[in-house]
């Protein structure tokens, strides 16, 4: 979970940019929540699309705004996990968050699974969530499609899929509503889940009215500032698909831990085309356009302006510059990550402090929820 303006509008989610200037004296403090799964070292797409935006939010937020960034271990369990690998991945993801610049003194940084209030609220929300809404969730439908493609039967066998995957969006809603978050940065694939979160907040508010609405309807966050907004980074080997940690081809993605030599080799082998000159055309030239997108994102530049600089150059020149730009972007966070990941006591202390702050914050919400539903 990494919690496009056009898409948000199309499905009815209000959006807001925390980078917009505003008079803090004329508005209420904002509560921003976002989470990321601890499944492997983040790749360039994660960094440019979600993690770097967390840093922008931290820098641009007002002093009275609350920021919560969570490693959502319970969500990872919807798919089979090796326990030892998951334990290491949780610790590494915390190190990554700190390495990129999230300050645990300014923001609440914590492991979701260290705060049982999430699962308690998830159960309560499950009891007011219509089955029909969950069946329309794209996560569930995509797993059904995968099941159908894997087997020879024409009918999908839902018994092969776990209930956690089916109710995953409700846990995501609980993650957000436990802190009465007002703003949620989400990725393109999670926008439908944010709409469900707003629906469940509204259902609870209407069902348990007194004395006033319990939950705000969280807004989709756009981090578009004066700089160019982050673009979706695609696979280096299949530029029709997004860069993904789950791809079996390690050459398809650039990891935060990749050395300069690894980065150069992966960019050099990236799929492009045989057309002379460089132009930005995502439909006809997805590979070339993906490299231009990466280069523009690394420098917070407009991709069409970047493309004009290369219109009379070749792919070799472009790939060399992209590799240099990516290395320049990642070398600082990479070095900091390698330093922090071995400081196990420091990481444990940060996690413990973050969990305590998160529990105190969410207990206020759960206490009121229990009272309203009759369980106080």
Predicted regions and their residues:
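N-terminal mitochondrial targeting presequence
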Residues: 1-29
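Conserved nucleotide- and phosphate/pyrophosphate-binding catalytic cores
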Residues: 44, 198-376
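Short amphipathic alpha-helical interaction patches enriched in hydrophobic/aromatic residues
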Residues: 40, 78-81, 181, 275, ...
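Short helix-capping/linker segments at secondary-structure and domain boundaries
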Residues: 129-136, 178-185, 296-306, 334
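Short, histidine-centered active-site or binding-site loop motifs used for metal coordination
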Residues: 36-38, 73-75, 183, 247, ...
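Structured ligand/cofactor/substrate-binding pocket environments in proteins
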Residues: 42-51, 68, 72-73, 83-89, ...
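Short capping/connector residues at structural and topological boundaries
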Residues: 41, 49-52, 114, 130, ...
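N-terminal Rossmann-like or analogous alpha/beta NTP/dinucleotide-binding catalytic cores
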Residues: 18-33, 38-174, 328, 338
